[in-house]
């Protein structure tokens, strides 16, 4: 004990030397620790008969319930920021609920996506899932709405439809499937309809508006014969993968297309303009794409509830409601279970070196201790409008807390 006392005092002095600059030379915790060490060792080799002064307890901070509420609020703000960042959006798209109703196509592909995937946010994820990387969202399905054509391909203001815009990210993916969807108006009686799709090109040479001859403005790329028997309208899909490949290889060749569907009387049944009653019936392109992915494994952690008295690090339930955010641009899910971490993390083991342990004991607030944080997270599926009013279906990684731990 006599030999150990100077060594203990030496470690304590070293700990005080290692304190961060700018702190007071005599903090309450350091003074108490020094007094305790001096009392145990005996300053100058003499034992003290006086008892060591008691150490005043440090403030506990917020009550558990207040701390949890603070953790919830931070988690919600973090989720909003992460979604925009992972979708590569600088800000939330300015799309109101009324605009969503107008743009949302009333078509089979969209309903199939909603039916195929659970968008309630409470279904169990598979044990294994694929991710593009650890951060950015993975695109699986892209729905591009028809837009107005460039004036360079119009004559006397027509045709106004249809041009499809694709981002560079989509053009560098592998296209597994590409379909053009066109809505045909109902017919009073069974009829044969001749649908044709023409590729548009700018007028060249003398082939300008009002001129004669010159370059061809229309190039037929697809022609279909369709038998209509329904009186309630019909969604017709056309394989467009080959055309899309040529557009992606040569983006400058994408000037849009013109769609016609004539019945025997010469009436064009294809809906290509947003007139009264045509909301959600505009042509659109559906793409299934494949991005590079890698395998990751999901592992659940310990759960607590809001009424739990547990003070240690634990996972708590948290439901994110996008409608409460005013984010109408997210089609599905409208809400999902995100969860959050909260609780205390204690030093479970003594540090590797004695002087490190003494530093932590002498100045616990100046030491970087373990924090309660997510140690495992999983993705969510999302169907949303981007800033170009295109409908995107993809997977956003790291949005559900599966496990919490001290790290």
From Swiss-Prot:
Pro-sequence residue ranges: 25-298
Localisation per UniProt entry: Secreted
Disulfide cross-links: 304-314, 313-372, 341-404, 345-406
Pfam families found in the cross-reference section: TGF_beta, TGFb_propeptide
Listed GO MF terms: cytokine activity; growth factor activity
A GO BP annotation: negative regulation of amacrine cell differentiation
ATP-binding as UniProt keyword: no
SMART domains: TGFB
Keyword vocabulary terms for this entry: Cleavage on pair of basic residues, Cytokine, Disease variant, Disulfide bond, Glycoprotein, Growth factor, Secreted, Signal
Glycosylation, residue list: 94
Signal sequence, start to end: 1-24
Annotated positions for site Cleavage: 121-122, 298
Post-translational modification: Synthesized as large precursor molecule that undergoes proteolytic cleavage by furin-like proteases. This produces an inactive form consisting of the mature C-terminal portion non-covalently bound to its cleaved N-terminal propeptide. Activation of the mature form requires additional cleavage of the propeptide by a tolloid-like metalloproteinase.
Organ and tissue specificity: In the embryo, strong expression is seen in the palatal epithelia, including the medial edge epithelial and midline epithelial seam of the palatal shelves. Less pronounced expression is also seen throughout the palatal shelf and tongue mesenchyme.
InterPro entries: Cystine-knot_cytokine (IPR029034), TGF-b_C (IPR001839), TGF-b_propeptide (IPR001111), TGF-beta-rel (IPR015615), TGFb_CS (IPR017948)
Disease: Vertebral hypersegmentation and orofacial anomalies: An autosomal dominant disease characterized by supernumerary ribs, supernumerary cervical, thoracic and/or lumbar vertebrae, and orofacial anomalies such as cleft lip with or without cleft palate in most patients.
Subunit structure of this chain's protein: Homodimer; disulfide-linked. Interacts directly with ACVR2B. Interacts directly with ACVR2A. Interacts with ACVR1B, TGFBR1 and ACVR1C in an ACVR2B-dependent manner. Interacts with FST isoform 2/FS-288.
Similarity-based family: Belongs to the TGF-beta family.
Annotated protein name in UniProt: Growth/differentiation factor 11
Organism from which the protein derives: Homo sapiens (Human)
